């Protein structure tokens, strides 16, 4: 028997795994990272986390915001909000605003993004800046300017529509319950269009140009390339854009508050202006005196509605994406 055959092989041993360091050791290893995060964490706790818990506590009291809350009412605030027709009207107006604004705005933003993404377009940067200027303009300033424009030119537009037979006479654009919400929606579409335009531009610029070149060689036209390449490649970013667009539209407040204050006759009252009027008073039919407890209850109920809607929205968009992928 040869020497190689008789030589004993060393026993195989499992590779040693270093023990996982403890929590304190991991914190010490990243101490500077936590030190840099500490100021933001303190601000988050002070201005986000604490107000949420404090506001939830106020829902059980009748309180005008002065002194300490002392009139404990249990769930009466929630019951009053649930039976308030103005609250449900405000919810309806908010959803109408969102479900009209978001689809129209997304279609316009995608169309403009396709045009501005064309490398042959001259002055593309200038046009991008022009479309984004309304976004960086305060909604309060926009509201005041729109009021001045309607005061100076609204009668002329109403006269023109009356002469063409579209309307029967002059229109008080923000004072008529039938037109006020539509005017606010149109202004909202224009004011926040730049956000979604930038998002779509960013998504379009991630699509490789080789895909369009290959599709062109295969005989695909612009319409086929749009539905076969652009839409599928924008699916992931499109979900994010849709969710963010709905979240932003559900938070509408300043534009409505400046233009109409929720009027006329609560025709444009949205949930955020409703909560504002409850918390600070001054809205006929809502609360003559401030009631922080009612405002907190309304905000929590509205928050629950938005959580449920957002979850259903994400699930629906994911289901649509999976069906398209399977097809």
Where are these regions (language model features)?
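A structural signal for multi-pass alpha-helical bundles of membrane permease subunits
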Residues: 29-327
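Short, Lys/Arg-rich, polar N-terminal cytosolic tail immediately upstream
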Residues: 1-27
